[in-house]
């Protein structure tokens, strides 16, 4: 285990609440907190047992004034989250008292932790690997139960074990090839090449199996970026409100009411959907509305799915056609809204749209919305949302797997030529290194720092 100084931070949201927690980690954690703690009969924390709690007060070290009534818990390393001695002060929630206690902890010798530093220490101390550390923040940020389940499984090491198995198999192939290179025999080289090709083919199948559902995994982690577009007053905001089952956007008969982008999350059978309601796209002289229209175009360009809303009670006009032309190369669904009104739209003209999904809905009555949700599942999850044994949810992991696959394919080509068997060993080591980036064995330090910088304070 590495040696670090003792760090402290508020581990809960800072605000009015029932309880706040100040977390302290390091070899001096217990002595630091003990110096500002007084229990019943002036009892300190010197004799506290690991995995136990003690009632008392946090005091101002200089004035001996009581700051708050607390319960202190102690976990002796390495059997703690960071694999170090960890003390947690459970105090009353509230900004003033929580900050005041943290100030006393720092004054007593601790250093303020940087974002994600507790989890980073767990990684550097070998308690978790990098993919497990990333799963911690994914679990915190999960928007649906399915997202949370996927993150929890990764935090428990499911992906780590799978990657570890593949890397161990790679080492066996490398050892076999390098032994053949060191002790060359013509017939042995041929046998090694043949066995190596078979083994590499099996590993390629395993990596392909992991990559097969990576796009689905990314959606579970980040949400399906879904942009609602259309000209003003076709019912985009009404659709957003209907999907969320609450009044989130202002709805009026005045075109251009929505002038900015509104983003909210919803769940479709566990799929986190990031719904983005945009300003109606049209030519306008209004400066504020014009900014909203430009934002709408940006969101469309960065979307996973575009939802084009057309007004069934009116025919297609030039504004509709301009939007259709703008999104024609995107993956999009067409919603014919206001089906509760008389239909005036030209259905034949709609057949020319580059979308096989044209759904009749009424945002006002909710008619057709279930069909819309089923189509989203069909488009991105083949109609069924199922948790796979091991799900690749992180783009960084996907890219590492792709690099490993490319190296394995290169090694297979080298093994086809027994004269280049030593080159295969180089490619196999590159694949092993790429896979090691997933669990952190071979990743660069700046990437590690970047990953943990995305964490919140106290985690």
Swiss-Prot record:
<dbReference type="Pfam" id="PF12631">
    <property type="entry name" value="MnmE_helical"/>
</dbReference>
<dbReference type="InterPro" id="IPR025867">
    <property type="entry name" value="MnmE_helical"/>
</dbReference>
<keyword id="KW-0819">tRNA processing</keyword>
<keyword id="KW-0963">Cytoplasm</keyword>
<feature type="binding site">
    <location>
        <position position="127"/>
    </location>
    <ligand>
        <name>(6S)-5-formyl-5,6,7,8-tetrahydrofolate</name>
    </ligand>
</feature>
<keyword id="KW-0479">Metal-binding</keyword>
<protein>
    <recommendedName>
        <fullName>tRNA modification GTPase MnmE</fullName>
        <ecNumber>3.6.-.-</ecNumber>
    </recommendedName>
</protein>
<feature type="binding site">
    <location>
        <position position="252"/>
    </location>
    <ligand>
        <name>K(+)</name>
    </ligand>
</feature>
<dbReference type="InterPro" id="IPR004520">
    <property type="entry name" value="GTPase_MnmE"/>
</dbReference>
<feature type="binding site">
    <location>
        <position position="459"/>
    </location>
    <ligand>
        <name>(6S)-5-formyl-5,6,7,8-tetrahydrofolate</name>
    </ligand>
</feature>
<keyword id="KW-0378">Hydrolase</keyword>
<dbReference type="GO" id="GO:0002098">
    <property type="term" value="P:tRNA wobble uridine modification"/>
</dbReference>
<feature type="binding site">
    <location>
        <position position="257"/>
    </location>
    <ligand>
        <name>K(+)</name>
    </ligand>
</feature>
<dbReference type="InterPro" id="IPR018948">
    <property type="entry name" value="GTP-bd_TrmE_N"/>
</dbReference>
<feature type="binding site">
    <location>
        <position position="88"/>
    </location>
    <ligand>
        <name>(6S)-5-formyl-5,6,7,8-tetrahydrofolate</name>
    </ligand>
</feature>
<feature type="binding site">
    <location>
        <begin position="233"/>
        <end position="238"/>
    </location>
    <ligand>
        <name>GTP</name>
    </ligand>
</feature>
<feature type="binding site">
    <location>
        <position position="233"/>
    </location>
    <ligand>
        <name>K(+)</name>
    </ligand>
</feature>
<feature type="binding site">
    <location>
        <position position="237"/>
    </location>
    <ligand>
        <name>Mg(2+)</name>
    </ligand>
</feature>
<feature type="binding site">
    <location>
        <position position="254"/>
    </location>
    <ligand>
        <name>K(+)</name>
    </ligand>
</feature>
<feature type="binding site">
    <location>
        <begin position="252"/>
        <end position="258"/>
    </location>
    <ligand>
        <name>GTP</name>
    </ligand>
</feature>
<dbReference type="GO" id="GO:0030488">
    <property type="term" value="P:tRNA methylation"/>
</dbReference>
<keyword id="KW-0460">Magnesium</keyword>
<feature type="binding site">
    <location>
        <begin position="277"/>
        <end position="280"/>
    </location>
    <ligand>
        <name>GTP</name>
    </ligand>
</feature>
<dbReference type="InterPro" id="IPR005225">
    <property type="entry name" value="Small_GTP-bd"/>
</dbReference>
<feature type="domain" description="TrmE-type G">
    <location>
        <begin position="223"/>
        <end position="381"/>
    </location>
</feature>
<comment type="subunit">
    <text>Homodimer. Heterotetramer of two MnmE and two MnmG subunits.</text>
</comment>
<keyword id="KW-0630">Potassium</keyword>
<dbReference type="InterPro" id="IPR006073">
    <property type="entry name" value="GTP-bd"/>
</dbReference>
<keyword id="KW-0547">Nucleotide-binding</keyword>
<dbReference type="InterPro" id="IPR027417">
    <property type="entry name" value="P-loop_NTPase"/>
</dbReference>
<dbReference type="GO" id="GO:0005525">
    <property type="term" value="F:GTP binding"/>
</dbReference>
<keyword id="KW-0342">GTP-binding</keyword>
<dbReference type="Pfam" id="PF10396">
    <property type="entry name" value="TrmE_N"/>
</dbReference>
<dbReference type="GO" id="GO:0046872">
    <property type="term" value="F:metal ion binding"/>
</dbReference>
<feature type="binding site">
    <location>
        <position position="258"/>
    </location>
    <ligand>
        <name>Mg(2+)</name>
    </ligand>
</feature>
<dbReference type="InterPro" id="IPR027266">
    <property type="entry name" value="TrmE/GcvT_dom1"/>
</dbReference>
<dbReference type="GO" id="GO:0005829">
    <property type="term" value="C:cytosol"/>
</dbReference>
<dbReference type="InterPro" id="IPR027368">
    <property type="entry name" value="MnmE_dom2"/>
</dbReference>
<comment type="similarity">
    <text>Belongs to the TRAFAC class TrmE-Era-EngA-EngB-Septin-like GTPase superfamily. TrmE GTPase family.</text>
</comment>
<dbReference type="InterPro" id="IPR031168">
    <property type="entry name" value="G_TrmE"/>
</dbReference>
<feature type="binding site">
    <location>
        <position position="23"/>
    </location>
    <ligand>
        <name>(6S)-5-formyl-5,6,7,8-tetrahydrofolate</name>
    </ligand>
</feature>
<dbReference type="GO" id="GO:0003924">
    <property type="term" value="F:GTPase activity"/>
</dbReference>
